[in-house]
Structure formats: C-alpha cells, structure tokens
A protein has these predicted regions:
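TM-lumen/periplasm interface segments of multi-pass membrane proteins
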Residues: 1-153
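Extracytoplasmic catalytic-loop and juxtamembrane helix elements of membrane-embedded
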Residues: 38-49, 53, 255-285
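Aromatic/glycine/proline-enriched transmembrane-helix motif characteristic
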Residues: 130, 151, 278-317
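Specific aromatic-rich, kink-prone transmembrane helix
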Residues: 135, 185-202
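Transmembrane and membrane-interface helices of multi-pass
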Residues: 137-144, 148, 153-155, 159-173, ...
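Membrane-interface alpha helices of multi-pass inner-membrane proteins
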Residues: 173-174, 203-227, 252
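Short acidic/glycine- and proline-prone juxtamembrane loop motifs at membrane-interface regions
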Residues: 178-186
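Perimembrane helix-loop-helix junctions
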Residues: 221-248
Length: 317
C-alpha cells in the first residue's frame, strides 16, 4: 500500500455510510418525539413528562399562526428573520397540501395543521442536518491532503471525504435536541460557509455566514474566528470581502424584517438583550437557588461572551 496510498472502494468511502447513518439517526429522532404528537384537541399531552418537548408545534398553536396573517407582523412570534421565513415557508407548504390556515380554522383544525407543520419542519431540518454532515465530511482531517491548487490557491480536485463526519452524525445532541427548534438551519449555513471559505470563496462564505447570523447570533462566533485567523495570516483582502458580504446580508435581512413588522422585530431584539433568564442555562440555576432575579441577563451574557472572545483572540495573536 505505502504511506501515501489512498484506499478506494465503498468500504473506504465515508460518504454513503455517513448519509445512511444520518438517515437512521434522524428517523430515531423523529420516533423519539412521536409521543408528543397530540391528535385530539380535547386530550392534552404533557411534553415535559414524556420528555419530547419541541417549540415548533407549540409555537404554531400558541402564537396564532394557524389563523393566518403575516408572521413578521405577529408580536407573539419574535424570532430571528431567517427563522421567521422558515416558519412562514413551512406553514405555506402545509396550506398548499390542504390544511386549514385561516381565521375560520377551529381548534381541531389548528391542531391538525400544527402536526402537519411539524412534519414539514422535520424535513427542512433533516436537509439542514445533511448539509452539516456533508460540510464536515469535506472539512475533516485528511480532506485536503496533497490536493493540487491553481494560481489563486483554489483546489483543482474535489476534496477527500473525511471520517470525522461521524462525530456529527452520531452525536447524541442531534438525537436529543435536533427537533426542539430551527437551530439546525443556522448551524448548516455556518458550516457550509466554512466549507466555502476553505474552497477560497470569500464572497459566498460571507453570504452564507450573514444568513447564519440572521438565523442565530451565535453564528457570529464562527465569523469572529475567521476574523482572527485572517488577521494572523494577514489575509486582509479576503477578510474584507467576507465581512462585507456577511454584513450586507445580515443588515438586509434585519431591514426587511423591520419594514415588514417593526413591533415584531423590536420584540425579537428585546427578547435577545432584555429578556429574563431562560430555561436550560446556568443563570436559571443561580436564579432558582437564590430566589431572586438577575436584571439585564442578556447584557451580562453578551459582555462575558465578548470579553472571552477578545481574550482568546489576544492569546492566539
């Protein structure tokens, strides 16, 4: 074989095995949340007791989505611009397949539409999960070993597939939290942005990262990592194109959201920076044990995050 030989054949190719594993894991994830599917509006289901809670159908029923109307003008939504678009898309698909989405919809019709809406969202999130898996497979260890490049530094051959993809497709977090909300979509956009950056496509990488940040501000941490790496390597022209594209896309998304529903957009900002302590955080544990409230938790968390990132950047420069 030799140390530089590259084994070939289906048994040495992680691609089909990763896709097959992703399908199995996602089917198990869907099966895990089936006890929370409510079929009769008169028979409530306790998702906490059954440990299969999801924001997706809950928000559909509680926010009035089932009665129609623009989601950007609905203050009960208060989601990021990208997530709001995804919610509107899933509801449109449900309506196109015959679900009753109108002010005349009964509670049972809203429940039926919510279940169908959840099914459409599961498909959308599965596509995002596949995008994450494929991106990691083309970014993992050995994916760019000895690849020839052109005069611009772009590889002239396809990247090799890495077995590191199984760290993602077999991750327990996917099984436990993959269907809680639409968070998988910003993750997919962020990972595909990294792949575009690795293929020397700064404009495309910036556009994808801007969309990812429009779906979740946590994606900005990845953009900050790219910023630090470019400053270390003095790749300023590529960094400029990357940041310009990402900033423009992010600003355009928020401007459109504000124009379509200023109150909803402002409610989202308030929930991000001025909301109370949320479930599943260390702040909730502190608040619950002390019996008091923590004011300005969003600003405290943001300040600690920015300070930590600046500290890491200073250590890596």
């Amino acid at each position: 074989m030799g140390r530089h030989a590259w084994p070939r054949g289906v048994f040495f190719d992680p691609g089909p095995w990763a896709i097959m594993s992703a399908i199995v894991v996602w089917l198990l994830t869907i099966y895990r949340v089936t006890p929370c599917v409510q079929h009769d509006v008169a028979k409530a289901v306790d998702p906490y007791q059954r440990q299969c809670y999801s924001d997706i159908p809950t928000l559909y029923r509680s926010s009035g989505m089932g009665h129609g109307g623009s989601l950007f003008a609905n203050p009960d939504i208060a989601q990021t611009p990208l997530v709001t678009v995804l919610m509107a898309f899933c509801r449109r698909v449900v309506w196109a397949f015959g679900a009753e989405v109108s002010p005349k919809a009964t509670d049972q019709q809203v429940l039926d539409a919510a279940n169908a809406y959840w099914g459409v969202a599961q498909i959308v999130l599965f596509v995002a999960f596949l995008a994450v898996a494929i991106s990691v497979m083309l970014l993992g260890r050995g994916s760019d070993t000895n690849l020839p490049v052109d005069d611009k530094g772009r590889p002239t051959q396809a990247r090799r597939r890495s077995w590191d993809v199984f760290w993602v497709v077999l991750c327990p977090a996917v099984y436990l939290a993959g269907l809680i909300d639409f968070s998988m979509v910003p993750v997919a956009l962020a990972t595909t942005s990294i792949l575009a950056w690795a293929r020397r496509r700064p404009w495309l990488a910036g556009i994808l990262m801007g969309l990812a940040c429009a779906g979740s501000l946590q994606a900005a941490v990845v953009a900050f990592a790219v910023l630090v790496c470019c400053l270390r390597a003095t790749r300023l022209p590529e960094l400029g194109r990357y940041l310009l594209a990402g900033s423009l896309v992010l600003v355009v998304c928020h401007v459109i959201a504000a124009c379509l529903g200023l109150h909803t957009w402002w409610a989202y900002l308030r929930s991000t920076f001025w909301s109370g302590t949320g479930l599943g955080t260390i702040w909730y544990v502190i608040q619950d044990s002390s019996g008091g409230t923590i004011p300005g938790i969003g600003w405290i968390t943001g300040t600690l995050t920015v300070g930590g990132l600046l500290g890491l950047a200073w250590l890596s420069m």
